[in-house]
Amino acid sequence: MKYLGLALISAVFLIGACQAETPSQKCEEKYKGNTDKISCLHHCKYQYYGFIDVNYNIAQSEIRKFSNVLMDYGVVDKSKKRELKKVMHECAKQVKKEARKDSHWLNCRTSINYYRCVLTSKLIGPQRFDKAIQDYDKTISV
């Protein structure tokens, strides 16, 4: 009888943990079958990761979070932190400028363009980048 409460609480947490999804799973489920919005898949995941905000903005806090993940997962050496943040700031400015030029404001395409810009930097290797994002994705429950 003493352990009944503990067993029930443990069961509730176990059930909750089993039902938890990663951002990738959640976003893929959200956009499954919706070909018009499939371009928003990256934005959905990056929003859960904290790399881009709900309104497609890429501010200092989002850049800090993204750069920390890339350094923590070994994509970029920590000694190149300043260079990485500079690249990310430049990419953020570039995608905002492109959005204004194309007579649309920030949208899902902005997220994809930002991702591409950061990924094509000489500091980042695509294979390490993808693995780091996949590994980071597994650490988040939605």
UniProtKB/Swiss-Prot annotation:
Keyword terms: Blood coagulation cascade inhibiting toxin, Disulfide bond, Hemostasis impairing toxin, Secreted, Signal, Toxin
- Please provide one cellular component term from the Gene Ontology annotations of this protein: extracellular region
What tissues has this protein been observed in? Female salivary gland (at protein level).
Q: Where in the cell is it found?
A: Secreted
List the signal peptide residues. Answer: 1-20
Q: Name one GO biological process term.
A: suppression of blood coagulation in another organism
Disulfide bond annotation, renumbered to this chain: C27-C44, C40-C108, C91-C117
Q: Which SUPFAM superfamilies match?
A: Insect pheromone/odorant-binding proteins
Coiled coil spans = none
The molecular function GO annotations come to: molecular sequestering activity; odorant binding; toxin activity
Q: Which family does it belong to?
A: Belongs to the PBP/GOBP family.
Q: What does this protein do?
A: Inhibits contact coagulation pathway activation in the host by sequestering anionic polymers, such as polyphosphate and dextran sulfate, and thus blocking interaction of protein components of the pathway with negatively charged surfaces. Inhibits dextran sulfate-mediated autoactivation of host coagulation factor XII (F12). Inhibits dextran sulfate-mediated autoactivation of host factor XI (F11). Inhibits polyphosphate-mediated activation of host F11 by thrombin (F2). May inhibit dextran sulfate-mediated bradykinin generation in host plasma.
What protein am I looking at?
A: Salivary protein 15a
Organism, as annotated: Phlebotomus duboscqi
Q: Which gene encodes it?
A: M02
